[in-house]
């Protein structure tokens, strides 16, 4: 009997026949095992999430970073409420073991210190009250004025305060609905416009208990304070998410407005995203398409259906455009019903220029406080006119009787917000009104400077008495039909006159009464170059330009060519510049590097077009080599500017580029009393130039009587006057 005969194969046969059940059982067991492992991992993860502050054991103590170095609480208070809130907030911050400082905005100089808060990892809290007529309190007035001007000043840019973390709480009264918490809204907006990072939605405290969200202003502050402390704790942990994460274009509001959340502004404003700060557009999608069409376009649309949607849209747009055109013609006639021309300053223009710091006068004039006026009031140096001609910058009023201009220069300071034209077609104000209000507005702006850190009392008193007037603010002053009467009024008030024209009105130059100093802008040496840079409105602009230079040569008073160098645009063809000099024979030639005006759709200039001071010096030296009657006289390095003087002002080896202003007033008075028969020349009222103002001096044009101020950031200052 063989071995196979005694071996029973029935068990194996049974397993083989039931193999499918065995496979299914193994698969089921494996599946259950995997499910158990997954569930265990999920339970472990959920337990870890319940301890958000648990330290990461993988990080060594040496690798931990400090995300918040401290908190600075700034307050602007009139009755002491904001100051009291600052003390309460400081106590709460101290509980987090963070250094805290309470600062009165009246004693804080943002020009010197605010940018320093960026690198210090400090969180800044601003508690500001709205006072009479929506204005800031006296203690916060200067800070708010500086912040507004900086936010609307192209030289600061949109990233000036990038990295600064801040939160704002406002104190107001909703009974004054139109001004409710206006100051805190503006501070929040201006900080955002300068690139600062908002860490918490703006809080609003309401003194009106009936309307207060939490029953009182104290309760409003307590709710905001709780949120602020919570945000600080998150920042300490390194969380970088700002606010509620729903900020768009400066509008800061939470998705859900629960207890303690800041309300949207009653008027629904977008803080820095206001209409005037957004890119211009014709209308919104809702306006163009209608509600139903707009809603349909928010979903997926078949290509074949686009025609059915777009045809009504185009028809609506044409009808709307036609209606708007008719309305515009009815709104804007060339003359008003009483026969007078339209006002040059429209509501939109008034709003734009007011934001830029202008004080507008009547219907076509304006005055603005120059940055160099502010600088000299604080003993920080004067402008290049102080170095070249001896004007007292803190007593200089910068104004214009005409905001309109005949050119659209690529380096225009105001991005062409002012109107343009080739003739006067607007309503005209009398020169007496212009001068009176210009002086009053200038004095009011000087008064607002009182209390600013570093202000010199004696210069403040002197600044209240205007001694010089620079008619060069913006626009074309010589377009004003009564410019001669205005100049005579200036001289009668003992104010010297510095008039700038863009060389497009030769006949007006010939008729011009004597001025202290007459400037002509020479922005290019060739026809094509002038067209490219100045973009004049006149078709015969080049002939007008040449005729203006010839008219300048006939003037007996001081005349100046003003050359603005734009690298890669007008720094070549020196011989052509020399020929233009021989055409007008100016007493002086100012050569200045262009000031970068920021990005603009109207200009293609970039920082690459701004020449360095060394490049301006080299250009001046090469130009003087072609002008046998001229030499380099003065330099003002800070303004990137040099002065070329005619040799007739160099007497016995000494330059006499400064002006004897009292002597000029005597001469112009004699001229007027004689009916114009008793004339005088530029050499009759010249004064000796001090050594520090000369080219090659160690001071580089900075008056040693003042103290030079260097900004904390090391970026080279190429800003102008």
From Swiss-Prot:
Leader peptide range in chain numbering: none
Catalytic activity from the UniProt record: N(1)-methylguanosine(37) in tRNA(Phe) + pyruvate + S-adenosyl-L-methionine = 4-demethylwyosine(37) in tRNA(Phe) + 5'-deoxyadenosine + L-methionine + CO2 + H2O
Binding site for [4Fe-4S] cluster: 405, 409, 412
Cofactor field: [4Fe-4S] cluster
Biased composition (Basic and acidic residues): 250-274, 313-325
E.C. number: 4.1.3.44
Biochemical pathway: tRNA modification; wybutosine-tRNA(Phe) biosynthesis
Pfam families xref list: Flavodoxin_1, Radical_SAM, Wyosine_form
Gene Ontology BP terms: tRNA processing
GO MF assignments: 4 iron, 4 sulfur cluster binding; FMN binding; metal ion binding; tRNA-4-demethylwyosine synthase activity
Flavodoxin-like domain: residues covered: 71-229
InterPro entries named among the record's database cross-references: Aldolase_TIM, Flavdoxin-like, Flavodoxin/NO_synth, Flavoprotein-like_sf, rSAM, tRNA_wybutosine-synth, tRNA_wybutosine-synthase
Ranges for domain Radical SAM core: 389-635
Protein family membership: Belongs to the TYW1 family.
Record protein name field: S-adenosyl-L-methionine-dependent tRNA 4-demethylwyosine synthase TYW1
Species of provenance: Mus musculus
Lineage of the species this protein comes from: Eukaryota, Metazoa, Chordata, Craniata, Vertebrata
Gene this chain is encoded by: Tyw1
């Amino acid at each position: 009997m063989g071995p196979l005969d005694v071996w029973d194969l029935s068990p194996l046969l049974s397993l083989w026949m039931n193999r499918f059940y065995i496979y299914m059982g193994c698969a089921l067991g494996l599946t259950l095992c995997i499910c158990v492992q997954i569930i265990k991992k999920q339970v472990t993860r959920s337990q870890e999430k319940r301890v958000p502050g648990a330290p990461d054991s993988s990080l060594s103590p040496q690798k931990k970073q400090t995300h918040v170095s401290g908190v600075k609480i700034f307050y602007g208070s009139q009755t002491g409420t904001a100051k009291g809130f600052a003390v309460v907030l400081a106590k709460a911050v101290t509980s987090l073991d963070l250094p805290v400082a309470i600062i009165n905005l009246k004693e804080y100089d943002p020009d010197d210190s605010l940018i320093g808060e960026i690198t210090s990892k400090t969180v800044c809290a601003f508690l500001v009250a709205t006072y009479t007529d929506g204005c800031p309190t006296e203690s916060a007035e200067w800070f708010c004025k500086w912040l507004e001007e900086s936010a609307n000043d192209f030289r600061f840019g949109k990233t000036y305060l990038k990295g600064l973390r801040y939160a704002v709480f406002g104190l107001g009264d909703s009974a004054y609905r139109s001004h409710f918490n206006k100051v805190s809204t503006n501070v929040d907006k201006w900080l955002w416009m300068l690139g600062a990072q908002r860490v918490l939605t703006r809080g609003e405290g309401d003194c009106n208990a009936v309307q207060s969200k939490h029953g009182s202003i104290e309760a409003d502050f307590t709710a905001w304070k709780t949120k602020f402390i919570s945000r600080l704790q998150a920042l300490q942990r390194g969380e970088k998410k700002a606010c509620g994460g729903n900020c768009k274009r400066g509008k800061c509001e939470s998705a859900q407005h629960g207890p303690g959340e800041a309300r949207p502004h009653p008027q629904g404003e977008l803080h820095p995203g206001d209409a005037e700060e957004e890119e211009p557009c014709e209308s919104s999608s809702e306006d163009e398409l209608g509600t139903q069409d707009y809603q349909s376009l928010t979903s997926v649309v078949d290509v074949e259906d686009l025609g059915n949607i777009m045809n009504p849209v185009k028809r609506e747009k044409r009808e709307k455009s036609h209606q708007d055109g008719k309305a515009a013609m009815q709104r804007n006639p060339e003359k008003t019903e009483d026969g007078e021309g339209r006002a040059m300053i429209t509501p939109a223009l008034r709003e734009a220029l007011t934001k830029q710091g202008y004080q507008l006068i009547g219907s076509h004039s304006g005055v603005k406080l120059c940055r160099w006026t502010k600088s000299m009031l604080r003993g920080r140096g004067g402008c290049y006119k102080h170095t070249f001609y001896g004007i007292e910058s803190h007593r200089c009023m910068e104004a214009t009787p005409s905001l309109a201009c005949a050119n659209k220069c690529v380096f225009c300071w105001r991005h062409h917000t002012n109107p343009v034209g080739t003739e006067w077609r607007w309503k005209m104000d009398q020169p007496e009104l212009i001068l009176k209000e210009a002086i009053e507005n200038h004095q009011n702006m000087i008064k607002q400077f009182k209390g600013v850190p570093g202000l010199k009392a004696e210069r403040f008193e002197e600044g209240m008495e205007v001694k010089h007037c620079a008619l060069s603010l913006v626009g074309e002053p010589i377009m004003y039909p009564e410019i001669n009467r205005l100049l005579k009024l200036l001289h009668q008030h003992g104010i010297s006159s510095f008039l700038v024209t863009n060389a497009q009105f030769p006949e007006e130059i010939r008729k011009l009464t004597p001025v202290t100093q007459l400037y002509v802008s020479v922005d290019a040496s060739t026809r094509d170059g002038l067209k490219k840079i100045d973009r004049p409105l006149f078709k015969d602009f080049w002939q007008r330009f040449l005729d203006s230079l010839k008219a300048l040569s006939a003037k007996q008073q001081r005349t100046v060519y003003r050359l603005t160098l734009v690298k890669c645009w007008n720094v070549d063809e020196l011989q052509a510049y020399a020929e233009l000099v021989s055409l007008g024979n100016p007493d002086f030639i100012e050569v200045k590097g262009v000031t970068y005006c920021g990005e603009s759709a109207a200009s293609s200039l970039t920082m690459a077009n701004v020449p360095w001071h060394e490049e301006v010096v080299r250009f001046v030296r090469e130009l003087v080599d072609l002008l046998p009657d001229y030499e380099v006289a003065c330099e003002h390095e800070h303004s990137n500017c040099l002065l070329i003087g005619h040799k007739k002002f160099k007497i016995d080896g000494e330059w006499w580029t400064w002006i004897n202003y009292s002597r000029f007033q005597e001469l112009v008075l004699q001229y007027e009393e004689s009916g114009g028969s008793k004339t005088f020349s530029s050499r009759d009222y010249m004064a000796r130039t001090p050594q520090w103002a000369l080219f090659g001096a160690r001071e580089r044009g900075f008056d040693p009587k003042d103290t030079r101020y260097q900004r904390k950031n090391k970026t080279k200052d190429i800003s102008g006057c």
